[in-house]
Amino acid sequence: MLIFFELGNSQLKAATILKGNYQFLGSVRHDAILSGEFIESFNLNEQNPTAVYVSSVAPSQLNAALTEVIQQHFKLYPTFLATQPSCCGIECGYEKFDQFGVDRWMAILGACSGSNKPTFIVDAGTALTVDAVIDKKHIGGFIVPGLGLMRDSLLKNTALSEQSLVLQSVQDGLLAKDTAGGVMGGTLYMLGSYLNSLLVDLELETGRKFDCIGTGGDFLSLKPVLDKPYNYVEDLTLRGMKEVIESL
């Protein structure tokens, strides 16, 4: 058995490969790492993997905590994957490839697996990232605040109270009639409009039509305001990790 962990800014996701069969195990919050509860949450108590692979954008303290639990439970040291200049036939667009986030790189590899079509990848997590691939080459991307960061910024830098966002918003039209709805709907439309406009401009600039793939904890909230159809893949980064290991 192989075990894969994706350690993001707020969650830990896991998957396994056993006898060639891939299985996504779900996600837990960071608290489960510090307590070691993620082993039980993912039903890994009785497993004896031959290798454990990690993709992480988390602080070093969390990486160390995850590593310690893995070592204690599985009696082996995890392999931390990193961005490469090229892998699985895909070329990284960053000249300094080591500065390109490993989460974005793995998402690209997962999204482009088995496809030669131009691909537009949106990861709506704590930060919202966008990347594009044409003819197996990553042509670049953007990073902007995610929905949560936008909403937190309004709370921290204005007179809005956190309580005002806890209240259930009731809307009978497009525009909000209370503070919660104003913040929730406004930030949603900001990101949705940004993605819609960016994709239009990108297709005009390149003369290509893109297949669109979305992932991340907030993507399903964004999907209703997006103009083009997106394929949602919850475990996209883990699937990219799988591609890396199978290419070795």
UniProtKB/Swiss-Prot annotation:
UniProt catalytic activity: (R)-pantothenate + ATP = (R)-4'-phosphopantothenate + ADP + H(+)
Pathway: Cofactor biosynthesis; coenzyme A biosynthesis; CoA from (R)-pantothenate: step 1/5
Residues that coordinate or bind K(+): 123
Cofactor (UniProt): NH4(+); K(+)
Keywords: ATP-binding, Coenzyme A biosynthesis, Cytoplasm, Kinase, Metal-binding, Nucleotide-binding, Potassium, Transferase
Pfam families associated with the record: Pan_kinase
Enzyme class label: transferase
Transmembrane segments: none
Superkingdom: Bacteria
Gene3D superfamilies (UniProt xref): 3.30.420.40
GO cellular component: cytoplasm
Compartments reported by the entry: Cytoplasm
CDD domains associated with the record: ASKHA_NBD_PanK-III (cd24015)
Gene Ontology biological process terms in this record: coenzyme A biosynthetic process
CC cofactor note: A monovalent cation. Ammonium or potassium.
Binding residues annotated for ATP, in chain numbering: 6-13, 126
Keyword Flavoprotein: no
EC numbers on record: 2.7.1.33
Residues holding substrate: 94, 101-104, 179
Location of the active site: 103 (proton acceptor)
GO MF annotations, alphabetized: ATP binding; metal ion binding; pantothenate kinase activity
Subunit structure, as described in the record: Homodimer.
Family named by the database record: Belongs to the type III pantothenate kinase family.
PANTHER family: TYPE III PANTOTHENATE KINASE
UniProt name for this protein: Type III pantothenate kinase
